């Protein structure tokens, strides 16, 4: 499971011209589910993401978590994170999990994260427009297999 997390001042997502999820200060999370991902991958990400100290304290140091600042998260499914560009010029998505299983794991990730912070989402498998006011910018790529 691959998560791209971005520290944001604001983020929202539109589907068919309508805002379906919107947050203020917090994390924009793009989540890619890879073949073979399990509940264990979710556990690893959940033990890390809400506790990462990537928000500035009163001294300007990255010392606070999204929980500490009472922030929220916007979680967007993004199967292209499982893509490979090793061969040729067209990305391969062979490593992306099957849609049904990916949706199940995505929803479970959202449920688990919402135990710690308020969570909004996009629409799974929809064509979305994601608007991000990145703060910093501060962006991290977290692969559950590397944790």
UniProtKB/Swiss-Prot annotation:
Motif (Gly-cisPro motif, important for rejection of L-amino acids): 136-137
Catalysis: reaction(s): glycyl-tRNA(Ala) + H2O = tRNA(Ala) + glycine + H(+); a D-aminoacyl-tRNA + H2O = a tRNA + a D-alpha-amino acid + H(+)
Major localization class: cytoplasm
The EC number(s) this enzyme carries: 3.1.1.96
Pfam families: Tyr_Deacylase
Bilayer-crossing regions: none
Gene: dtd
GO cellular component terms, semicolon-separated: cytoplasm
Assembly description: Homodimer.
Subcellular location: Cytoplasm
Organism: Persephonella marina (strain DSM 14350 / EX-H1)
PANTHER family, per the entry: D-AMINOACYL-TRNA DEACYLASE 1 (PTHR10472:SF5), D-TYROSYL-TRNA TYR DEACYLASE (PTHR10472)
Domain remarks in the Swiss-Prot or TrEMBL record: A Gly-cisPro motif from one monomer fits into the active site of the other monomer to allow specific chiral rejection of L-amino acids.
Any GO MF annotation of the entry: Gly-tRNA(Ala) deacylase activity
UniProt cross-references to SUPFAM superfamilies, sorted A to Z: DTD-like
Gene Ontology BP terms: D-amino acid catabolic process
Family to which this protein belongs: Belongs to the DTD family.
Alphabetical keyword list: Cytoplasm, Hydrolase, RNA-binding, tRNA-binding
Function, in words: An aminoacyl-tRNA editing enzyme that deacylates mischarged D-aminoacyl-tRNAs. Also deacylates mischarged glycyl-tRNA(Ala), protecting cells against glycine mischarging by AlaRS. Acts via tRNA-based rather than protein-based catalysis; rejects L-amino acids rather than detecting D-amino acids in the active site. By recycling D-aminoacyl-tRNA to D-amino acids and free tRNA molecules, this enzyme counteracts the toxicity associated with the formation of D-aminoacyl-tRNA entities in vivo and helps enforce protein L-homochirality.
Entry protein name: D-aminoacyl-tRNA deacylase
